[in-house]
Amino acid sequence: MGDPGLSKLQFAPFNSALDVGFWHELTQKKLNEYRLDEAPKDIKGYYYNGDSAGLPTRLTLEFSAFDMSAPTPARCCPAMGTLHNTNTLEAFKTADKKLLLEQSANEIWEAIKSGAALENPMLLNKFLLLTFADLKKYHFYYWFCCPALCLPESIPLIRGPVGLDQRLSPKQIQALEHAYDDLCRTEGVTALPYFLFKYDDDTVLVSLLKHYSDFFQGQRTKLTVGVYDPCNLTQHPGWPLRNFLVLAAHRWSGSFQSVEVLCFRDRTMQGARDVTHSIIFEVKLPEMAFSPDCPKAVGWEKNQKGGMGPRMVNLSGCMDPKRLAESSVDLNLKLMCWRLVPTLDLDKVVSVKCLLLGAGTLGCNVARTLMGWGVRHVTFVDNAKISYSNPVRQPLYEFEDCLGGGKPKALAAAERLQKIFPGVNASGFNMSIPMPGHPVNFSDVTMEQARRDVEQLEELIDSHDVIFLLMDTRESRWLPTVIAASKRKLVINAALGFDTFVVMRHGLKKPKQQGAGDLCPSHLVAPADLGSSLFANIPGYKLGCYFCNDVVAPGDSTRDRTLDQQCTVSRPGLAVIAGALAVELMVSVLQHPEGGYAIASSSDDRMNEPPTSLGLVPHQIRGFLSRFDNVLPVSLAFDKCTACSSKVLDQYEQEGFTFLAKVFNSSHSFLEDLTGLTLLHQETQAAEIWDMSDEETV
């Protein structure tokens, strides 16, 4: 038992100081890396011995806590810890805190017994952090523990704490500062958690713990040590001293009767360094009977009410609302990767730049679904204004947008996207798209305007990754199809009937530097099995576009049409279905390693192993709402296509707007003559006449 006449040493426990950056980094780690993994993780904190008077003893964790190689802040001492992050609040509450403390304490005890703590004294200052992160509410529950081994009896004070300036002269204090700094530089560290020191009238010497036998050679009464002390109390040392005294009692109680402890505190105020507020005292070193069993340990932090329990931090109120929205938008997407689709590459989807040609019913629904997938860059092109019939079918508009003649759709749609989610980069262009069969040569003004529209469209397609064709008329899709095919851009097309729709990806032409016989991009196409469909295993560069099934060139489809024929009359739910499928098709294409060159999946592939983590990658999806049915046809590129055939693309790339102006200002026969459709019609008619002649002779 200790001497009842001596006062007992008491210690100031650590207070956890978890920075907002730590919680942000934990959120990112949980979403992107840990997911459902509850295995312990190594983290790193630090404590500082230069705080002003009145501040508590703090162990700080910042955003860099998860990077074990991150540098420790200047003049701070690192502390290694273990993070136990649970998946549910119930698991957090029912975690065996006693077992966690015992396991960590046993690691410290083993380091003491083996001598590893002498080689690496940081092993004495381990900590635990038990957490649960509610990422929907941004509530973070945690319980901090800094394990401290308990000696069999209290530690009696032989000489009570006094200021360093009462024990050492100014010359000795200056020598101590220089000796400590030199040792830190020699070891390449910002601070030493523990060090040996001895002093006489003229000199002060310091050394590492592992050199104690040489440093105190011949001395058998008193051990003098320095402890990097984060405490500011004048009569009590900080928590790091506790485990060191257990180490000293275990290893040196047979050689030394007492320990003189310097609680080294190093403060800079008004540019002047001061260590005189450090305290120095002497304690009796208790004898510690040899035992292989780990001593009892304490260390769980009390909560804000002073009781034994966890703490909770609510960061939802102090976070930037825009950043909070951005994190929340990504939450559901990242949760897909935890269990359902662990191979999903979200970066490919989020970073894609999408150009929506058409801001009507299809355009609005496509835009909302793109935002649901986390796409951050959306551009609208449309020349119409919002009418009173639009808001009920087009969810980006409201009644006020129709007043005063109506706002331009493209600009209003972009503005509404930014109101829905400020993190989206949305823009709108109020412009017309020149079309075949719609002349632009009425005057120099109209011709020049058409030229500017074409140049603007070329720039937009060139600066985006995926082009959505969502317009009302067939001919309005021709020019973007040609430009996108020439620039090798992925095109997703959606078109509506009354109760039918088609969603398709255009075939992606080979890179221009490849020869006609090269496969694209690098993988051979698997041969079709005998007896399989004629359209099996068709690679992306052989797939047709929206116009490849036509045997006539596009023209003015609005001429001589009644009102019900001019407007897109379709069942109200059709655009929502088609718009969603268009975006999902894009995402599936992006997830395929070949991208737009992916082999097309057909209806025959529905029972086969899907090519991507999200399933099939079809060429077309044709839906029939009257039967609630979809089919996945595949069609080959047509060598006489009026939009994507080599003849059309060559003319466009060679002549540019000159060629396009001929298409706009001429009848459909111009494109048909160019591509060979006219000759095909003539040959077909000749064959029919020949068949009739044969029948007449019979």
Swiss-Prot record:
Widely expressed. GO terms for molecular function: Atg12 activating enzyme activity; Atg8 activating enzyme activity; protein homodimerization activity. Homodimer. Interacts with ATG3; this interaction is essential for the transfer of ATG8-like proteins's thioester from ATG7 to ATG3 and plays a role in the conjugation of ATG12 to ATG5. Interacts with ATG12. Forms intermediate conjugates with GABARAPL1. Forms intermediate conjugates with ATG8-like proteins such as GABARAP, GABARAPL2 or MAP1LC3A. Interacts with EP300 acetyltransferase. Interacts with FOXO1. E1-like activating enzyme involved in the 2 ubiquitin-like systems required for cytoplasm to vacuole transport (Cvt) and autophagy. Activates ATG12 for its conjugation with ATG5 as well as the ATG8 family proteins for their conjugation with phosphatidylethanolamine. Both systems are needed for the ATG8 association to Cvt vesicles and autophagosomes membranes. Required for autophagic death induced by caspase-8 inhibition. Facilitates LC3-I lipidation with phosphatidylethanolamine to form LC3-II which is found on autophagosomal membranes. It comes from the Eukaryota. The C-terminal part of the protein is essential for the dimerization and interaction with ATG3 and ATG12. The N-terminal FAP motif (residues 11 to 13) is essential for the formation of the ATG89-PE and ATG5-ATG12 conjugates. Induction: Induced in liver hepatocytes by 24 hours of starvation. It comes from Rattus norvegicus. It is found in: Cytoplasm; Preautophagosomal structure. There is a cross-link at residue 41 (Glycyl lysine isopeptide (Lys-Gly) (interchain with G-Cter in ubiquitin)). InterPro entries: Atg7, Atg7_N, Atg7_N_1, Atg7_N_2, ThiF/MoeB/HesA, ThiF_NAD_FAD-bd, Ubiquitin-activating_enz. The keyword Transmembrane helix does not apply. One of its GO terms (biological process) is autophagosome assembly. This is Ubiquitin-like modifier-activating enzyme ATG7. Belongs to the ATG7 family. CDD domains: Apg7. PANTHER family: UBIQUITIN-ACTIVATING ENZYME E1, UBIQUITIN-LIKE MODIFIER-ACTIVATING ENZYME ATG7. Acetylated by EP300. Polyubiquitinated on Lys-41 via 'Lys-63'-linked ubiquitin by TRIM32; this modification positiely regulates ATG8 and ATG12 activating enzyme activity leading to initiation of autophagy under metabolic stress.
